[in-house]
Each structure stands twice: as C-alpha cells, then as structure tokens.
From Swiss-Prot:
It catalyses: a (3S)-3-hydroxyacyl-CoA = a (2E)-enoyl-CoA + H2O; a 4-saturated-(3S)-3-hydroxyacyl-CoA = a (3E)-enoyl-CoA + H2O. The gene is echA17. GO terms for molecular function: enoyl-CoA hydratase activity. It is an enzyme of class 4 (lyase). It comes from Mycobacterium tuberculosis (strain ATCC 25618 / H37Rv). This is Probable enoyl-CoA hydratase EchA17. CDD domains: crotonase-like.
C-alpha cells in the first residue's frame, strides 16, 4: 500500500494501494495523536474521506484504522466543554454524519482496532462491517463519565450488537471492558495479537477485492435496511436492487459497476 491522497487536509488520510499489491484495498486513517480524539474538524474530514472512498472506482474494500497505538479515545472533551447548547447540537449532527458516512461506504469495511476504542471511537468502529481487535484493547461506552450519553447512533449500534440489557449496563456504567468481553458481546468479530491487527483486517478485506462491486454494494445496503426500513419498503428495495444487479451482470458490468442504493 502506498500513496497518501491529500484530499482531506489535517487529521484523516485516505490511503489507496498503488496497485503493486492488494489492488483495490484502501485505508481511512485517523491521525490526530496522541489519542485520535474526535473534534468537529475530524468528523468533517471523516465524512469527506468516506465519501471519497465510496466514489472511487479503484477502491474495493476499506480498512478503518487509527494506527498501531490507538483507534480512538472518543470525543475531544476540551472542545466539547467550550460549546454552547446550540453548538453542541451542531456537533452532534456532524458526529452523526461521520458515523453514517462510514456505514454508507458501499464496499466492505473493516475496523482495525488497537489500544482503545472509547465513546465515539467505539461508535465509529461499530459503523464498519467487521471489526478486528488486538487482544489488549480496552473498550467503553464512556460518555456517561462526562455526564453525557452516546450519540451518532451509538446506543442503537451497541444495542444491535450486544442486546438491550447489556447495552444499558455498558452505557449506564461507562466502564472499560476488554477485548475478550467485546468478542463475547458481539462488538468485535476477531481478536488477534496486538501486532497482527492490521494484517488480520487486511486479510479479511482481501477476500472481497475481486468480488462483484455492484452486488456487494447492493447486499450491504439490503442488510442495513433490515434495521432501517419497514418490511414492505425493505422488500421492495431488495427486489429493486436484485433487478439492478441482474441487469448489470447481463450487461457484463458485474466487475465494473459500483453502487447499491
């Protein structure tokens, strides 16, 4: 992998394979040391990066990564403490847009989680299709410790994965929990040695680099619709996507067409 694309200016990079190996593999890299704390600017850059990755025809699968040391410690609390109620509402909207943008990337996505995934960092990881964690990672829905609650659809995503009782306990307490518990709760899908996190995520993503892009995008959107649409609307959307994918395959475009909504 090579060639950082400087389309997002400061804290979030899009890194796309140069084609020498793993053609089609890309990375959305959080880069705000030391903890990848999330500010309004970081969220805006996440939106821009996710949208770019969704559009690019040279991208087939995406790794969401915060680097070797830490995924994200969540929201930047010093910034939050300076906000008025109106500004906090705007910040919550931007946070939601970032999480939604990652979830809407019409390609397989995997979060490679190192160090800590706390608060909004955990929510962002839950927006990926698959999550690989180091066995030393600490997780937490920690917003309550600052007198807040998860936003960015964080409580819904946590509840879908862990169930309502477990989600309430985690949110009410804000406690840290380890990767083994995260795996048991269904919040992560694989647990590996800390030095193997990125490689394990890349191995998962490689499985789909040669897949039919239009069909993968349609399948991803259809599964997401299970939680988002009423049954009749969901079934109609599924049927529409099936016909679109069928037509793309008939036209010989199964590899070249990208999209799904």
């Amino acid at each position: 992998m090579a060639a950082v694309t400087p389309t997002v200016p400061e804290f979030v990079n899009v890194v796309v394979s140069d084609g020498s190996q793993d053609a089609g593999l890309a990375m959305l890299l959080l880069s705000r040391p030391p903890t990848n704390a999330m500010t309004r600017q970081v969220y805006r850059e996440v939106v821009a990066a996710a949208n770019e990755l969704g559009r690019r025809d040279d991208v087939a699968a995406v790794i969401l990564y915060g680097g070797h040391e830490i995924f994200s410690a969540g929201d930047d609390m010093p910034e939050l403490r300076t906000l008025s109620a109106q500004e906090a509402d705007t910040a919550a909207r931007i946070r939601q847009q970032a999480v939604d943008a990652v979830a809407a990337i019409p390609k397989p996505t995997v979060a490679a989680i190192t160090g800590y995934a706390l608060g909004a960092g955990l929510t962002l990881a839950l927006a990926a299709d698959w999550r690989v964690s180091g066995d030393n990672v600490k997780f937490g829905a920690t917003e309550i410790l600052a007198g807040l609650i998860p936003s960015g659809d964080g409580m819904a995503r946590l509840t879908r994965a862990a169930g309502p009782s477990r989600a309430k306990e985690l949110v009410f307490s804000g406690r840290f929990f380890d990767a083994e518990e995260a795996l048991a709760l269904g919040l992560i899908d694989d647990m590996v040695a800390p030095d193997d996190v990125y490689d394990a995520a890349a191995a998962w993503a490689r499985r789909f680099l040669d897949g039919p892009p239009h069909a993968l995008a349609a399948a991803k959107a259809g599964i997401s619709d299970v939680y988002e649409l009423a049954p009749a609307e969901r079934i109609a959307a599924e049927r529409r996507r099936y016909v679109e994918v069928f037509a793309a395959g008939q036209g010989g475009g199964s590899k070249g067409d990208r999209g799904g909504r």
